[in-house]
Amino acid sequence: MADNDAYAPVDTPMGPVFVAWNDHGVCRVEPGTDAARFEAAFNDQFGRPVTRSDGPPPTSTADPDAPVDWRGVPPFDRAVLTAIRAIPPGDAWTYGEVAEAIGKRGAARAVGGALGRNRVPVIVPCHRVVAAKGLGGFGLGLDAKRALLAAEGYPAVADQGRLLP
C-alpha cells in the first residue's frame, strides 16, 4: 500500500517550514523555502518521493493532537517525543524532567539525543525542553527555539541562553 506522502509550506513563528504527511500522520517538518531540497531530503530519509499538495496540511502545526507517523522511531525516542507533547504552550520542562516523566531518571543526555532526532519539530514541541541552567540546544538553531518559545508566551530568553523570570 502506498503511503500517499504529500507536503506543503507553512508559516511558523520561526519562519517558513515544509510539513510532510501521509496516511499515518505527519512524518517530517523542516525549515526552508527550497522545495527541491526538501523533496530530495525526504527521499533520502524515507526512500520514496513526496508530492507537493495543492492545499495545506490536514493538521495545524499548533495542534497538540496532530497525528504523527511514528513508524521507524525507536521505542525510547517515541517515549520521549510522546511525553513532551504534554508540555503546554508557554511552559517548558528540563531534559531531566522529561527523563523522569518516562521513568528513566538520570537519562537527561539520552533525552537530548532523542529530541535531536525528532523529525517533526514544532508538531512534537522539542523546543519546550530546556537545560536546567539555560536554553539548551535545538536542532533548528537557538534563534528558532527562542522565536517559538516567545510566540507561545514563554518568559524572555537572554542572548546567552539563560532563562529570565
Q: Where would I find each of the regions flagged by the language model?
A:
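Basic nucleic-acid-binding alpha-helical/helix-turn surface characteristic of O6-alkylguanine DNA
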Residues: 1-106, 155-165
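Short Lys/Arg-enriched helix C-cap and helix-to-coil transition segments
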Residues: 122-129
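Regulatory, non-catalytic segments
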Residues: 109-118
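Short, solvent-exposed alpha-helical "recognition" segments
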Residues: 117-122, 137
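…primarily DNA-binding HTH/wHTH and HhH modules…
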Residues: 133-165
